[in-house]
Every structure is written in structure tokens, then in C-alpha cells.
Design a protein with these regions (language model features):
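Short, structured active-site "lid" loops
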Residues: 46-60
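Conserved positions at the start
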Residues: 51, 112-115
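Short Cys/His-rich zinc-binding micro-motifs
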Residues: 12, 56-57, 86-89, 115-119
């Protein structure tokens, strides 16, 4: 069984704590641009929140597209990026291959960004004050 995040966008308070803590884990400092989870919303009609993150899908389009085999699925079903194998620079096939738009390319950053479930204990779930995220 694939372990992945589950979201209830209706509970999201738009506090952005999940993105801040995720980026801290991913790159060492808090900047939502480097987060594996993205929050978007539509205003003004009705507040509609969308949370985008890697679903650890069974299809593994990103894995298949990587010319360096830098994306691998572990024994828990979590797709992880082996940074030492990732040699893509400007063109990142995994970003384009993801049907869910859940792998992100950040300018001037050497690796794609995606949710890797924080080694099985997602920090975003731990810090979410509204219970919008769970495993």
C-alpha cells in the first residue's frame, strides 16, 4: 500500500505553516517556493482551497521519465529523490511527466522539489493547526 498525504481542503485556514515547515525540511530554510506542498485559493466568490502535493501515485510517471534513475519508490511506496543521482539542470522531465503537477522546479535550485513524506513522518501534518492534512 502506498503511503501518502490526505487532505481536507475545507479545513485549511491558509496559514501556510505546512509549506513553511516543508521547505525547511527540503532545503534548510522556510520559503514556500521550496515546499513539496502548494496551497492555492480562489477569491472572491467562494473561498475554494486547493492543496497540491505528490500523491505517491502507482503510475510513477516521474520515475519512468527520469533519465538518471534519481527518483525511486521505497518499500513504503514513497517516491524519493536521490539527489546524488539527479543531474538535470534546466530541463526536468519529472516535472513535466507528473500528471498531478506535484513536482516543482524552482529557478536557481539544483533539484526538483516534491513531497517525500519526511521519511514517513510528514512535518506538515504535525504542524497543521486545522487538521486539513493527515496520513
Amino acid at each position: 500500500m502506498n503511503k501518502s498525504l490526505k487532505a481536507n481542503p475545507q479545513n485549511c485556514s491558509l496559514c501556510n505553516l505546512c509549506a513553511l515547515v516543508c521547505s525547511k525540511v527540503q532545503v534548510g530554510y522556510s520559503d514556500p517556493a521550496f515546499s513539496g506542498i502548494r496551497i492555492s485559493h480562489e477569491l472572491p466568490a467562494a473561498l475554494k482551497v486547493k492543496l497540491t502535493y505528490c500523491l505517491q501515485c502507482k503510475q510513477g510517471y516521474c520515475i519512468k521519465s527520469c533519465p538518471y534513475q534519481a527518483l525511486v519508490r521505497d518499500e513504503q511506496g514513497i517516491v524519493r529523490l536521490a539527489r546524488d543521482k539527479c543531474h538535470c539542470t534546466e530541463i526536468r522531465p519529472c516535472v513535466e511527466a507528473c500528471k498531478f503537477k506535484a513536482i516543482y522546479s524552482v529557478p536557481l535550485w539544483q533539484y526538483p522539489i516534491k513531497c517525500d513524506m519526511c521519511q514517513g513522518s510528514p512535518r506538515c501534518v504535525q504542524v497543521c493547526p486545522s487538521g486539513a492534512l493527515r496520513v
